[in-house]
């Protein structure tokens, strides 16, 4: 979550007249994340999240995102719900941006997740994949193999400013993935961004998943690889096989991976590491100075990518035979 677009109290109060949510008591911007502008609202009834959708989010995709949250919640997944306006619509406009009110989900994200938390994340990810079945709106993954080349071209000329030799390394990685990317794996709705700050816990109990604004249709095991990258590396860059084993066991307790998915994990993990490296690289090079945004280090994901290149078998991630 982040703040790119400022709002005034008067404009916000006018916006809230379109909703049955009580009286505004206070609001503040939320600085975490890099995509939309988000605010925590306290009203006379309930706390709420206000999201203003910035230019990177296509307005045509919003029915998918908001409808998906409704669908998943109806299937028993704990996630925020978009609140309808008095006219029944889920979207309004504020400060020149499409905007929505979202229910507030209790819990906190974990700064230092342990293996037991990774197991719960694996279970929740698999539960989301199962719950997503039957959702009839489709959204291709614009940040998968086909989209990486275009994203790279936006940063390629300045890549060696971040680390010498980066241009040649990433060109080679794109060539490899273009030739070896798995096809015909089970697919469905994926979260595509299930980092620790998008998973809430109350104590050791997972209370819900948030931030579905990268969700799309893709191979389900690709989502697993994203979580391995996001949850199972330590701050020193080392892969924690205990966390990996817990996450994968949790996932397979709900939705067992096929042999083909297991075999593809090293390549999928290279791809998901590259995907987050490329978006972080672009943001690192282009985010305006002074924006209320937390920029993330692209080299963290370059190191993860290099780790996955050395993997000979998915057993090295913690998968039991």
Curated annotation (Swiss-Prot):
List its EC numbers: 2.7.1.39
Keywords noted in UniProt: Amino-acid biosynthesis, ATP-binding, Kinase, Nucleotide-binding, Threonine biosynthesis, Transferase
Catalytic activity, as annotated: L-homoserine + ATP = O-phospho-L-homoserine + ADP + H(+)
Top-level division of the source organism's lineage: Bacteria
GO molecular function annotation: ATP binding; homoserine kinase activity
Q: Do the record's keywords include Oxidoreductase?
A: no
Designated name of the protein: Homoserine kinase
- Organism of origin: Rhizobium rhizogenes (strain K84 / ATCC BAA-868)
Q: What is the lineage of its organism?
A: Bacteria, Pseudomonadati, Pseudomonadota, Alphaproteobacteria, Hyphomicrobiales
């Amino acid at each position: 979550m982040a703040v790119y677009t400022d709002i005034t109290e008067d404009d916000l109060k006018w916006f809230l007249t379109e909703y049955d949510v009580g009286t505004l008591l206070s609001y503040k911007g939320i600085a975490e994340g890099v995509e939309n502008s988000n605010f925590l609202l306290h009203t006379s009834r309930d706390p709420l999240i206000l999201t203003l959708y910035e230019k990177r989010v296509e307005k045509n995709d919003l029915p998918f995102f908001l409808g998906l949250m409704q669908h998943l919640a109806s299937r028993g997944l704990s996630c925020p719900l978009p609140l309808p306006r008095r006219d029944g619509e889920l979207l309004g406009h504020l400060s020149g941006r499409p905007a929505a009110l979202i229910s507030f989900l209790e819990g906190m994200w974990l700064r230092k997740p342990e293996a037991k938390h990774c197991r719960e994340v694996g279970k929740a990810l698999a539960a989301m994949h199962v719950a997503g079945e039957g959702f009839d709106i489709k959204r291709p993954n614009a940040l998968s193999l086909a989209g990486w080349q275009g994203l790279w071209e936006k940063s390629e000329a300045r890549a060696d400013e971040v680390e010498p030799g980066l241009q040649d390394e990433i060109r080679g990685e794109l060539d490899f993935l273009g030739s070896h990317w798995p096809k015909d794996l089970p697919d469905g709705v994926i979260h595509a961004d299930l980092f620790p700050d998008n998973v809430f816990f109350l104590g050791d109990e997972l209370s819900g998943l948030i931030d579905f604004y990268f969700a799309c249709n893709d191979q389900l095991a690709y989502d697993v690889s994203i979580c391995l990258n996001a949850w199972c590396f330590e701050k020193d860059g080392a892969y924690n096989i205990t966390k990996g084993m817990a996450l994968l066991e949790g996932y397979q307790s709900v939705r067992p991976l096929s042999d083909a998915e297991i075999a593809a994990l090293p390549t999928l993990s290279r791809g998901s590491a590259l995907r987050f490296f490329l978006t972080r690289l672009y943001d690192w090079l282009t985010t305006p100075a002074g924006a209320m945004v937390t920029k993330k280090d692209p080299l963290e994901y370059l190191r993860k990518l290099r780790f996955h290149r050395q993997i000979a078998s998915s057993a090295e991630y913690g998968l039991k035979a």
